[in-house]
Amino acid sequence: MDIQAVALLILTSTCVQADRICVGYLSTNSSEKVNTLLENDVPVTSSVDLVETSHTGTYCSLDGISPVHLGDCSFEGWIVGNPACASNMGIREWSYLIEDPSAPHGLCYPGELDNNGELRHLFSGIRSFSRTELIAPTSWGAVNDGVSSACQDRGASSFYRNLVWFVERGKQYPVIRGTYNNTTGRDVLVMWGIHHPVSTDEARKLYVNNDPYTLVSTSSWSRKYNLEIGIRPGYNGQKSWMKIYWYLMHPGESISFESNGGLLAPRYGYIIEEYGKGRIFQSRIRIAKCNTKCQTSVGGINTNKTFQNIERNALGDCPKYIKSGQLKLATGLRNVPAISNRGLFGAIAGFIEGGWPGLINGWYGFQHQNEQGVGMAADKESTQKAIDQITTKINNIIEKMNGNYDSIRGEFNQVEQRINMLADRIDDAVTDVWSYNAKLLVLLENDKTLDMHDANVRNLHDQVRRALKTNAIDEGNGCFELLHKCNDSCMETIRNGTYNHTEYEEESKLKRQEIEGIKLKSDDNVYKALSIYSCIASSIVMVGLILAFIMWTCNSGNCRFNICI
């Protein structure tokens, strides 16, 4: 037993004095958690939330270009030229338009703007225009300009600024004709309209002729309008009806008008100076002195995140809209806290026993123990490769989620309810697909990231094992017990891959033989002791069995002792 104690003491002394190097990874006090396909709430050293949830709460300039608020005017009132919207007539450029959903000044005369939703959508793609006179009112002939008390201008009857309502002059209304040739080299928006009286008496009073008509023609189409007599729900003291039409003329096109009653002739139109992505936002939030690269109807979004869940109808350089409120992408390692008491007398330990809280400037690294003390150093090369891989992952997610789908829901008003419903359903379906794809993609990437970190640590471990060859004992926990003395310079060669195992091969061979010899002697003594104990135990058992047999036979009368003197 004394030999065993001596052997154990020698072995313990050898273990304490041996130089060691361990491979490990960073651990922190981070509370970050991510989800993967197989696990939820996996602790990680760091992560990034890919979904933006905050906004400015205001309208901002978009990339330095200010928006235009239409004030008390609706889009229809502004574009047709309601006299109450005169202050907006000078608008030329905007990043986007803002319309108060309850603006009081729309079409001042009862009626409607044909294909209103399509025109709104067109203006969502216009960034600037200029207002220009198309046909002078005096060029049409012997007719008068009509006005209405429904369209007040500073207390007097007036009419739309961009149209001319022709009525009889001297109880005559001859056939009038007018033509506009688009020689601007740009697209031009032209508007005209038809007045539909409440009765034939009103029609004769205004236009004299029986069955008035209007003919509008271009080189590619022609349309004839007749008056639709009848009383309609009205407002502003009027019950007749005006329907306003529009056409976007391309360079070189001409448009001609012929009428003998009921025509609202074009006076001013709009030359489209610049197309671009825009929106007509409808909300009551205020305009602020701020700049953003992404604008929604609830506020600006300034972020570099991949996704946002603020609003689907966004304008500018915007993150993709998804329904998820949070998508966390792992950017660090699986966070395994260090074991507080580990190793012999608190010695260093490898990655199997947890992470290292003291690792600086790296995710993976080395910890060593020798006569000069204990040291720790990060492996910057493997860390940088991992960082590059994660950066690539984020960029790939952005690229994969970039699509050409744009919502058109915000461009339609209440007239096009069925279009709105269809747009909503399409938007919901597309958003569901984007949201599912985004979540699945992040879960997959989290799995890959954590697996990548595990692989990187094991690759580093294998790299050290291949370098040390037979000069060390792999302890199986991420550490190697060196069979030779290794100062700090020697440790550095192991870390940077310049270690020369042949230089220490002879010393290591002798050390290995010494350790194996001590273990063999210790094992022999143990075997001898076990043999003695086994022999004694077997003898005692045999004696006990014999005595028990004798006592049983005596009690049953089968055995008799005769004592002779």
Swiss-Prot record:
Post-translational modification: Palmitoylated.
Record note on quaternary structure: Homotrimer of disulfide-linked HA1-HA2.
Any one GO BP annotation for this protein: fusion of virus membrane with host plasma membrane
Note: Major glycoprotein, comprises over 80% of the envelope proteins present in virus particle. The extent of infection into host organism is determined by HA. Influenza viruses bud from the apical surface of polarized epithelial cells (e.g. bronchial epithelial cells) into lumen of lungs and are therefore usually pneumotropic. The reason is that HA is cleaved by tryptase clara which is restricted to lungs. However, HAs of H5 and H7 pantropic avian viruses subtypes can be cleaved by furin and subtilisin-type enzymes, allowing the virus to grow in other organs than lungs.
Disulfide bridges in this chain: C22-C479, C60-C290, C73-C85, C108-C151, C294-C318, C486-C490
Membrane topology: Single-pass type I membrane protein
Gene name, Swiss-Prot/TrEMBL: HA
Lineage: Viruses, Riboviria, Orthornavirae, Negarnaviricota, Polyploviricotina
Main location per the UniProt record: virion
Annotated source species: Influenza A virus (strain A/Gull/Astrakhan/227/1984 H13N6)
Protein purpose: Binds to sialic acid-containing receptors on the cell surface, bringing about the attachment of the virus particle to the cell. This attachment induces virion internalization of about two third of the virus particles through clathrin-dependent endocytosis and about one third through a clathrin- and caveolin-independent pathway. Plays a major role in the determination of host range restriction and virulence. Class I viral fusion protein.
Molecular functions per Gene Ontology: host cell surface receptor binding
Compartments reported by the entry: Virion membrane; Host apical cell membrane
Cytoplasmic topological intervals: 553-565
Listed InterPro entries: Capsid_hemagglutn (IPR008980), Hemagglutn_HA1_a/b_dom_sf (IPR013828), Hemagglutn_influenz_A (IPR000149), Hemagglutn_influenz_A/B (IPR001364)
Gene Ontology cellular-component annotations: host cell plasma membrane; membrane; viral envelope; virion membrane
Lipid group attachment sites (S-palmitoyl cysteine): C554, C564
Extracellular side: 19-531
Site for Cleavage, residues: R342, G343
Keywords: Clathrin- and caveolin-independent endocytosis of virus by host, Clathrin-mediated endocytosis of virus by host, Disulfide bond, Fusion of virus membrane with host endosomal membrane, Fusion of virus membrane with host membrane, Glycoprotein, Hemagglutinin, Host cell membrane, Host membrane, Host-virus interaction, Lipoprotein, Membrane, Palmitate, Signal, Transmembrane, Transmembrane helix, Viral attachment to host cell, Viral envelope protein, Viral penetration into host cytoplasm, Virion, Virus endocytosis by host, Virus entry into host cell
Name the record gives this protein: Hemagglutinin
Record field: transmembrane: 532-552
SUPFAM superfamilies, alphabetized: Influenza hemagglutinin (stalk), Viral protein domain
Annotated Gene3D superfamilies: 3.90.20.10, 3.90.209.20
One Pfam family in the UniProt entry: Hemagglutinin
